[in-house]
């Protein structure tokens, strides 16, 4: 959105093939690293409430973030809008890949120049999110565990 205060921080053009380097650029300093930001917590709560079907609670958390960023409060929020907001808010923080996997969305393939070709995008099967359960664990007389799908 044009009035989003974050727009000026990330909109530009570059064809050098490098990714953003901002959140953890100085790993040798003694400053505390922020592992989770409150904005991510708001987005996580929004997503959880949307998935549970509680749109009113989802909208409350979503609008907290929007108004912090100088945007007008939304009347509704959908999962699609949440996905776009996570992209804007958490850009360069290393979370996008995991978001795409969690949502079951294709992971885009980028060339060195940053160009994408949707034909090259990858959908990651669910069994690649979990490890196989060792046979020894499944054979235990106290276990009723079944193998994870795909193994």
Predicted regions: what they are:
Residues 1-151:
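Acidic/polar-rich alpha-helix caps and helix-coil junctions
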């Amino acid at each position: 959105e044009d009035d989003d205060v974050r727009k000026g921080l990330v909109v530009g053009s570059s064809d050098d093939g490098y990714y953003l380097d901002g959140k953890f650029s100085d790993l040798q300093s003694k400053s505390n690293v922020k592992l989770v930001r409150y904005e991510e917590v708001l987005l996580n709560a929004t997503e959880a409430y949307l998935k549970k079907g509680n749109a009113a609670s989802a909208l409350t958390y979503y609008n907290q973030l929007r108004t912090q960023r100088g945007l007008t409060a939304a009347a509704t929020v959908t999962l699609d809008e949440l996905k776009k907001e996570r992209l804007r808010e958490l850009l360069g923080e290393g979370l996008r890949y995991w978001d795409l996997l969690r949502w079951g969305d294709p992971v885009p393939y980028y060339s060195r120049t940053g160009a994408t070709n949707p034909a090259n995008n990858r959908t990651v099967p669910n069994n690649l999110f979990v490890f196989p359960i060792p046979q020894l664990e499944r054979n235990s007389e106290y276990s009723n565990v079944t193998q994870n799908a795909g193994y």
